[in-house]
UniProtKB/Swiss-Prot annotation:
Biological function: Antibacterial protein involved in the immune response to septic injury. When combined with 14.026 kDa and 14.059 kDa hemolymph antimicrobial peptides, it has a strong cooperative activity against the Gram-positive bacteria B.subtilis and S.aureus, and against the Gram-negative bacteria E.coli DH5-alpha and K.pneumoniae ATCC 138833. Does not show detectable antibacterial activity when present alone. Has no hemolytic activity in human erythrocytes.
Disulphides: C26-C45, C31-C53, C35-C55
Protein name per its UniProtKB record: Defensin-1
GO CC annotation terms, alphabetical: extracellular region
Location(s), subcellular: Secreted
GO biological process terms on file: defense response to bacterium; innate immune response
């Protein structure tokens, strides 16, 4: 029973996360932290409707 509850909670979290990311658009905080974790100085969003993440 606990496993089912945990799976339902994870599914809800993933669903909410998908709703906050607008059609794959770049999210600054996610892009920036991803770039920093890979050893870059910062990350920024660019392109039409800021769709792409660029590390520098």
């Amino acid at each position: 029973m606990k496993a089912i509850v945990v799976l339902l909670i994870l599914a809800l979290i993933l669903c909410l996360y998908a709703m906050t990311t607008v059609e794959g658009a770049c999210q600054f905080w996610s892009c920036n932290s991803s770039c920093i974790s890979r050893g870059y100085r910062q990350g920024y969003c660019w392109g039409i409707q800021y769709k792409y993440c660029q590390c520098q």
